[in-house]
UniProtKB/Swiss-Prot annotation:
<feature type="transmembrane region" description="Helical">
    <location>
        <begin position="212"/>
        <end position="234"/>
    </location>
</feature>
<feature type="transmembrane region" description="Helical">
    <location>
        <begin position="150"/>
        <end position="167"/>
    </location>
</feature>
<feature type="topological domain" description="Periplasmic">
    <location>
        <begin position="35"/>
        <end position="37"/>
    </location>
</feature>
<keyword id="KW-0472">Membrane</keyword>
<keyword id="KW-1133">Transmembrane helix</keyword>
<keyword id="KW-0812">Transmembrane</keyword>
<feature type="domain" description="EamA">
    <location>
        <begin position="18"/>
        <end position="145"/>
    </location>
</feature>
<feature type="transmembrane region" description="Helical">
    <location>
        <begin position="129"/>
        <end position="146"/>
    </location>
</feature>
<feature type="transmembrane region" description="Helical">
    <location>
        <begin position="271"/>
        <end position="290"/>
    </location>
</feature>
<comment type="similarity">
    <text>Belongs to the EamA transporter family.</text>
</comment>
<dbReference type="Pfam" id="PF00892">
    <property type="entry name" value="EamA"/>
</dbReference>
<dbReference type="GO" id="GO:0005886">
    <property type="term" value="C:plasma membrane"/>
</dbReference>
<feature type="topological domain" description="Cytoplasmic">
    <location>
        <begin position="123"/>
        <end position="128"/>
    </location>
</feature>
<feature type="topological domain" description="Cytoplasmic">
    <location>
        <begin position="61"/>
        <end position="72"/>
    </location>
</feature>
<feature type="topological domain" description="Cytoplasmic">
    <location>
        <begin position="291"/>
        <end position="294"/>
    </location>
</feature>
<feature type="topological domain" description="Periplasmic">
    <location>
        <begin position="198"/>
        <end position="211"/>
    </location>
</feature>
<feature type="transmembrane region" description="Helical">
    <location>
        <begin position="38"/>
        <end position="60"/>
    </location>
</feature>
Length: 294
């Protein structure tokens, strides 16, 4: 890879993880809209944005090829349920003052990825990776044993996104095409819920202020733009390099929660964060050491 491609890849990766990191600020703007309604808008408008993007980039041939493989289509239904659940839990957490725990979930996620890789893909742990995973587990167990609480939201986000990544890895479908099919699977449920079941003060778009409707439609942009940046970065950078950017998102979430939204991490959360941060430091050092050996 030449230097120009690498620079472009770095900028795209920074853009993707920066947008993901500050996404909670967008959801805070529409905190008064129920989380399930925000999810339906995210699904509906993401679908239409993906249709537009695939049309502009002329990638419908890939969609046609995918439609000829029923097994992949049905596996994308599973990944759609996983990512939909992840989106719903994240939106609910942010708008119910659990942004810190959401950030913890995405700090834990890389370690869960390692664990699932070992269990389902036959990948072997290096010693330092074992240590990192054990420390992360200890952080959760100490919180449970000492404080009688469990970071359910964090674990839910970490495991749902990790299983989503595992399923997508197994399917091996291009990101944009896969997301179109995922949102297509979720579209009927989202549309039926929004137009037939939801009955809140914001569920009828014809009665909403234009500014609110534009914010709700922006859910599609918040979803698709960072994905496009990420896929662009993935084609220009080595995966080992791209992996180091994944901590930008949860770090920004943590800073937003503490600095702007008044969330104060209690002793139980700080104990768990401390274990996770040490585990991630070991994980990153091991990755750097392994990369240099190659």
């Amino acid at each position: 890879m030449d230097a120009k491609q690498t620079r472009q890849g770095v900028l795209l990766a920074l853009a993707a993880y920066f947008i993901w990191g500050i996404a909670p600020a967008y959801f805070k703007l529409i905190y008064y809209v129920p989380a399930d309604e925000i999810l339906t808008h995210r699904v509906i408008w993401s679908f239409f944005f993906m249709v537009a993007l695939l049309s502009v980039s002329r990638q419908w041939r890939q969609v046609k090829r995918l439609l000829k493989t029923p097994k992949k289509i049905f596996l994308l239904a599973l990944s759609a349920v996983l990512v939909g659940g992840n989106w719903l839990l994240f939106i609910w957490a942010v708008n119910n003052h659990h942004m810190l725990e959401a950030s913890l979930g995405y700090f834990i996620n890389p370690l869960v990825n390692i664990l699932l890789g070992m269990i389902f893909l036959g990948e072997r742990f290096r010693r330092m990776q074992w240590l990192a995973v054990i420390l992360a587990v200890c952080g959760v167990l100490v919180q449970l044993w000492t404080f009688g609480s469990l970071p359910i939201i964090a674990l839910g986000l970490a495991f749902s996104f990790a299983f989503y990544g595992l399923v997508r890895k197994k399917i091996a479908v291009e990101a944009q095409t896969g997301m179109l099919v995922e949102t297509l699977w979720l579209l009927p449920v989202a549309a039926i819920y929004l137009f037939s079941i939801a009955d809140s003060a914001t569920s009828h778009m014809g009665q909403n202020a234009l500014s609110l409707n534009l914010l709700l439609m922006a859910a599609g942009v918040v979803t698709t733009i960072p994905l496009l940046c990420f896929t662009g970065a993935a084609t220009r950078l080595r995966l080992s390099t791209l992996g180091f950017f994944q901590y930008i998102g949860p770090t920004l979430m943590f800073l937003l929660a503490v600095t702007f939204y008044g969330e104060v991490p209690g002793a139980d959360k700080m104990v768990t964060f401390a274990f996770i941060w040490v585990a991630l430091a070991i994980f990153v050092m091991d990755a750097i050491y392994t990369q240099r050996k190659k």
